[in-house]
Curated annotation (Swiss-Prot):
<dbReference type="GO" id="GO:0005886">
    <property type="term" value="C:plasma membrane"/>
</dbReference>
<dbReference type="GO" id="GO:0005576">
    <property type="term" value="C:extracellular region"/>
</dbReference>
<dbReference type="InterPro" id="IPR042560">
    <property type="entry name" value="Exo84_C_2"/>
</dbReference>
<dbReference type="GO" id="GO:0005856">
    <property type="term" value="C:cytoskeleton"/>
</dbReference>
<dbReference type="InterPro" id="IPR016159">
    <property type="entry name" value="Cullin_repeat-like_dom_sf"/>
</dbReference>
<keyword id="KW-1003">Cell membrane</keyword>
<keyword id="KW-0206">Cytoskeleton</keyword>
<dbReference type="GO" id="GO:0048471">
    <property type="term" value="C:perinuclear region of cytoplasm"/>
</dbReference>
<feature type="compositionally biased region" description="Basic and acidic residues">
    <location>
        <begin position="515"/>
        <end position="532"/>
    </location>
</feature>
<dbReference type="GO" id="GO:0005829">
    <property type="term" value="C:cytosol"/>
</dbReference>
<dbReference type="InterPro" id="IPR032403">
    <property type="entry name" value="Exo84_C"/>
</dbReference>
<comment type="similarity">
    <text>Belongs to the EXO84 family.</text>
</comment>
<comment type="subunit">
    <text>The exocyst complex is composed of SEC3, SEC5, SEC6, SEC8, SEC10, EXO70A1 and EXO84B. Interacts with SEC6, SEC10, SEC15B and EXO70A1. Interacts with EXO70B1. Binds directly to B1L.</text>
</comment>
<dbReference type="InterPro" id="IPR042561">
    <property type="entry name" value="Exo84_C_1"/>
</dbReference>
<keyword id="KW-0963">Cytoplasm</keyword>
<dbReference type="GO" id="GO:0006893">
    <property type="term" value="P:Golgi to plasma membrane transport"/>
</dbReference>
<feature type="region of interest" description="Disordered">
    <location>
        <begin position="511"/>
        <end position="532"/>
    </location>
</feature>
Length: 752
């Protein structure tokens, strides 16, 4: 066995998925010429056009996602700068008003100081006399004195509309008095100060009332509109947002997460509160302030902040516990509920789903990985006690109705059931762009299961690998018989070719509920199918790893003895000429055993691979190729043939030629004659002819006609398969049920 294992080591191939970015690198180049590229693609076929469309759609999605990330990365800085500019503009306006007021005071003081009584003209005295007697001016001063008291009364009685009208009236009169100088500078500045003080008082009243939880929608909008009329729009908008925040915070007091409650219910209730508040705030902002960029930017910043806080609450009270326990369905449903509420805001121009994804995606990925790990560990535990006998699904299983298709061993049944449940859970992951990650994770789990199947083969490499990490996974029930070993391949091939791809089709369904949308479904299918086709191809390539290990193991069993000696040595051909002409030509023993083994496996495969005959044929083809290619590449064998102490004689050449013809004959009858097999046998024959020619004899003069070889091959197949010459009909195909004779009876016809 040590010799077999030493010869069976090979470097495993690694599958690397082609990244989309590599395929799109051409489009990202600064030197990309769109017109030249389109012209070069005008002659491509339909398949290439579809592939190009897929690449362009991927580029579009990647570009949109990159732009969104860039916007959100720089948005806080943009908002902060905009707000600073707005504040600066407000300060400049205040400074301008202050300078104007001070200029008026200075001019008034200058006029009073510079009056010279000695130089007062008669005209000035007359004008002063007229002004003193002007009753209108006295009434204005009286009004200016009483106006602050009138404002105080309106504010005390909370007659907001009348107060706003009074403020407007007062500001108009102040403006006129300032232009016409109908009031003294002291009275004018006193009046301006009184109006500003009362306006500030009213603004404080409105802001306080707006932030009360008892303030209803109409009252809130009226208060904010009044606050805006007072001339402080930025504060009014901030108060509006704070009011909505205070209201939903007050409503949240009755919402308390419980360790025994369903996380989805808590998430749904909290989502309703938060995103309804954001939606109403957006509606109020648009109705009162319009689409002014400064206010829209503040709304986006505020909504993003509330969404961040919401996501942290859901993460702490609903997602974290589910993810830690590997509850993928619970975690995915919580995330889906939140994203569903959040997506409704996109109609209002608020795209906040990326904010949720930033927090939800890592923790849902954690639940996804925990779920996959559980599938891997449970399947490995089942494999430790698997008897490797194909059975129908357990009674009561949801897959029992398709039992005729799903005959698997116990560990594969368990793996399939867990995968089906897994894909029931991952539907909501599509909205988080985790569909590809789910497929990749399941590929890793399936690859791990195939490794378990490989270790179940007697003398497998992995079983003796000291670097293999998980010691618990080394415990696996050995598949001792050929039927058990074929069951390993039946497990892997059925899972990779049918069951897993069929389950993965659930990812192609429209999870938004619009499954009957005939316009969207073809596009979704076109976009997702290439990824799933590539995924299925990778699954099947993983099965090839098990197939190679199976064929290598059986080829080594044929070629080597338990002690490490070879059944396929040069001596069996170079020594045959010592027996002289008295040789009963028949295929060599090792090729008789190969034929018998293939027949036994074909008989077993007929029951195990129902509906998958192509896989059975490819397996027999691979096993035959393994033996022939090993002989073709065995340098020690050819060194003995070409340079050994005894040259290859005519009878040895004839026997070697017969063996290769025999392989070609039964492979052709069994429908598994491949190009590689044909090439390998031809190469062996060519090497043998060349070695014989080196002795100075024409090889073709020593070889009988092809009919002689064909007759012996047909006779050998009939005898080895238990048929008599009188039995008409074709030799049983190795892909049909064959009752082959035992190897011991085959040895009676062997010759060296």
């Amino acid at each position: 066995m040590a010799a077999k294992t030493a010869r069976s080591k090979a470097t495993p191939t690694k599958e690397n998925g082609v990244r989309v970015e590599e395929g799109l690198s051409l489009f990202k180049s600064d030197k990309f010429d769109a017109d030249a590229y389109v012209q070069s693609k005008c002659s491509i076929n339909e398949k290439d056009i579809k592939q190009l469309c897929s690449y362009l759609l991927d580029l579009k999605r990647a570009s949109a996602e990159e732009m969104r990330r860039s916007v959100y990365a720089n948005y806080p800085a943009f908002i902060r700068t905009s707000k600073e500019i707005s504040d600066l503009e407000g300060e400049l306006s205040s400074i301008r008003n202050l300078l104007s007021t001070q200029a008026t005071l200075i001019h008034g003081l200058a006029d009073g100081v510079n009056i010279d009584d000695d130089k007062v003209s008669d005209e000035s005295l007359a004008n002063g006399l007229l002004n003193f007697e002007d009753n209108g001016l006295s009434d204005l001063e009286k009004w200016a004195t009483e106006f602050p008291d009138h404002l105080d009364a309106l504010l005390a009685e909370r007659r907001v509309d009348e107060a706003l009208a009074a403020f407007d009236e007062g500001e108009i009169l102040v403006s006129q008095a300032n232009e016409k100088h109908t009031l003294s500078s002291s009275v004018l500045s006193s009046l301006q100060f009184a109006i500003a003080e009362r306006k500030q008082k009213l603004a404080d009243q409105l802001a306080k009332a707006a932030c009360q939880p008892s303030t209803r929608g109409g009252e809130l909008r009226s208060a904010i509109a009044a606050l805006k009329r007072l001339g402080d729009g930025p504060r009014a908008h901030t108060v509006l947002l704070d009011a909505h925040f205070q209201r939903y915070q007050y409503n949240m007091q009755s919402l308390r997460p419980s360790s025994t409650s369903y996380g989805g219910a808590y998430t749904a209730a909290l989502s309703q509160l938060v995103f309804s508040a954001i939606s109403q705030a957006s509606s109020d902002s648009l109705g009162i302030f319009g689409k002014e960029p400064a206010y829209s930017s503040e709304l986006v910043t505020w909504a993003t902040k509330q969404t961040e806080a919401f996501s942290l609450l859901v993460k702490r009270h609903a997602l974290a516990s589910s993810a830690a326990a590997g509850g993928l369905r619970a975690a995915a449903e919580c995330a889906q509920i939140a994203l569903g509420h959040c997506s409704l805001l996109e109609a209002r121009g608020l795209s906040l789903c990326p904010v949720l994804l930033k927090h939800f995606k890592p923790i849902v990925e954690q639940a996804l990985e925990a779920n996959l790990k559980r599938i891997e560990e449970n399947t490995a535990a089942m494999a430790a006690a698997d008897d490797w006998v194909l059975t129908s699904p357990p009674a009561g299983s949801r897959h029992a109705s398709t039992a005729f298709q799903n005959k698997l061993t116990s560990s594969a049944h368990r793996f399939n059931l867990m995968v089906q449940d897994f894909f029931e859970d991952v539907g909501p992951l599509l909205s988080m762009q985790l569909g590809s990650k789910a497929l990749e994770g399941l590929f890793r789990v399936f690859n791990s299961y195939v490794d378990v199947l490989v270790r179940a083969l007697p003398g497998s490499i992995e079983e003796e690998d000291p670097n293999f990490e998980s010691s618990c996974n080394k415990i696996v029930q050995m598949a001792e018989t050929e039927a058990n070993q074929l069951a390993l391949l039946a497990n892997a091939s059925l899972l990779a070719d049918e069951l897993l791809p069929r389950a993965a089709m659930k990812l192609s369904l429209d999870q938004t509920g619009q499954r009957t949308d005939d316009l969207r479904r073809p596009l979704d299918r076109q976009n997702r199918n290439p990824e799933q086709r590539e995924w299925k191809r990778r699954l099947l390539s993983t099965v090839d790893k098990l197939k190679d290990a199976f064929c290598r193991q059986h080829a080594l069993d044929l070629i080597f003895t338990e002690e490490g000696d070879s059944h396929l040595s040069a001596d069996m051909y170079v020594n045959i000429d010592e027996n002289g002409e008295d040789v009963d030509f028949f295929p060599s023993l090792i090729f008789q055993e190969l034929f018998a083994k293939l027949n036994r496996m074909a008989s077993l495969a007929a029951d195990m691979f129902v509906g998958r005959e192509r896989f059975a044929i490819s397996l027999l083809m691979r096993l035959t190729e393994t033996v022939i290619l090993w002989l073709s590449g065995d340098q020690s064998f050819w060194d003995d043939i070409e340079e050994g102490p005894r040259p290859l004689g005519p009878l040895g050449l004839r026997q070697l030629y017969l063996d290769m013809k025999f392989v070609i004959c039964f492979a052709s009858q069994g429908r598994y004659l491949s190009r590689n097999l044909h090439r390998g046998t031809n190469e062996i024959i060519s090497k043998a002819l060349a070695a014989f020619t080196a002795t100075g004899i024409d090889p073709y003069s020593e070889l009988p006609e092809d009919d002689w070889f064909n007759d012996i091959c047909v006779d050998a197949m009939e005898r080895l398969s238990g048929k008599t010459k009188g039995n008409n009909g074709d030799v049983h195909s190795p892909t049909a049920s064959v009752s082959a004779q035992s190897v011991s009876s085959a040895r009676s016809h062997g010759s060296y």
